[in-house]
Amino acid sequence: MHTDDPVLDLMDRFTAALNSHDLDAVAALVTDDIVFESTSPPPDGTRYEGRDAVRRIWAEMLTTTPQARFSVEEQFSAGSGRAVVRWRYDWADGHVRGVDIVRVRNGQLAESLAYVKG
C-alpha cells in the first residue's frame, strides 16, 4: 500500500477489489458520476458514465472471465488527484498490457481512461 499517497492507496484498494471480484467494494471506491472509458472496441473504446453503469461493465467482465487478474506493473501520482497506472490483465488463455489515466475526487475514483498495447 502507498499510505503516503492517498491516490495510489485508492488505486491499490481498487485493484484488490477487482481481483477479489468484490463489486460492492469497487462501487464504494468510485464517485456517483464516474466516467470510465474501456479499451474496446477499438479504436476508441466505450464510455460508461455513472456508478451503476461502471458496476455493470465490471460485473460482466468478471463473470465472463472469472479467473482473470490485474497486476500493477507501475503506478505514479501525477499531482492534483491524478495518477497513471500501468497494468497487465491476465486471463486463462492470454493477457494484455495497458495504462489507465485516472482522476480522484474526494477520495474516490472519478475518472478512468484505459488504453492498451496492440
Features from the language model and the residues they span:
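C-terminal and inter-domain tail/linker signature
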Residues: 1-118
